[in-house]
Amino acid sequence: MRLELLVVLLVGLAALAPSGSTCCKTEPPRCETEPPRCETEPPRCETEPPRCETEPPRCETTTPKCETTPPTCRTEPPTCKTEPPTCRTEPPTCKTKPPTCRTEPPTCRTEPPTCKTKPPTCKTEPPTCKTEPPTCRTEPPTCKTEPPTCRTEPPTCKTEPPTCKTEPPTCKTEPPCEKHCTKRIKRHRTKRTKRSKSTKKIVHHHNRPGTTPESGCGCGSKNESGGGGSGCILKDLLTPKCPDSKPKPQASPKCKSDPKPKAASKTTSKPKPKACDSGKKNTTKKPRKTQPQKGGC
């Protein structure tokens, strides 16, 4: 762009010059100036990272080998021979216990060997281990056994006649008036019966031996005062009566479930056994509805 402007200025100056002057043909200078070619290549900075190869120092420290042999201390066991004591005692006329001869055991004291080994001093390259020889001192055992002294005094036998005082025992055993044996019988559960009414508690009453229902200890229920009501007639007929029977003090009545009153309650009519029933039954139970029979009956 600058070269073109210079050429235009030179042409303009030549045109303005006076034409009547000498004929000087001045050709315009040809300035062929090529623009400089600046080829600047980017610098190639190839810097390799420094390779620092530092080997770790090899520190080889050999451990000193200190071989210390353990001291061999042999202590022979003491041989203490003690003859058994000969105690001869004449057999006495009375039976006496055999004499007790106490022989004290021999006291053999063996002191433990004192083996003192100093710790080895190991110096590097080469190790010098100095171990002093062990000094084992074993004193001979001193066994002192005194002869046993057996003293047997003549036995004194005193036998007094035994005094046996045996008083006749006073046995006062009154059997209880009445015992109730409870036994649970599971009913067959149906849709109508509830879970709480599936088990029925049956109370069995037992008479005192030798008593009758009239005396007050009958087969009445817990709620009844004296028992022996009209419902006990069937029970008295079923239980066997012993003529002129007296109460035995040593035997108490046992509670066993008698199957006879249960069988009698099924065969008898409904209003009679209600007197002997326990008071725990639900009296407000609604009667079941009887379905009408099909047919003319």
UniProtKB/Swiss-Prot annotation:
GO terms for cellular component: extracellular region. Residues 26-84, 141-218, 243-297 are annotated as: Disordered. GO terms for biological process: puparial adhesion. Residues 27-58 have a biased composition (Basic and acidic residues). Residues 181-208, 282-291 have a biased composition (Basic residues). Changing P249S: In strain: Berkeley, Oregon-R and Oregon-R(2/10). The keyword Secreted applies. The keyword Signal applies. Residues 1-21 form the signal peptide. It is found in: Secreted. Salivary gland. One of its GO terms (molecular function) is bioadhesive activity. Residues 59-84, 141-174 have a biased composition (Low complexity). Keywords: Repeat, Secreted, Signal. Its main location: secreted. Sequence repeats lie at residues 26-32, 33-39, 40-46, 47-53, 54-60, 61-67, 68-74, 75-81, 82-88, 89-95, 96-102, 103-109, 110-116, 117-123, 124-130, 131-137, 138-144, 145-151, 152-158, 159-165, 166-172, 173-179. Residues 26-179 are annotated as: 22 X 7 AA approximate tandem repeats of T-[ETK]-[PT]-P-[RKT]-C-[ERK]. Changing P106A: In strain: Berkeley. This is Salivary glue protein Sgs-4. The lineage of its organism: Eukaryota, Metazoa, Ecdysozoa, Arthropoda, Hexapoda.
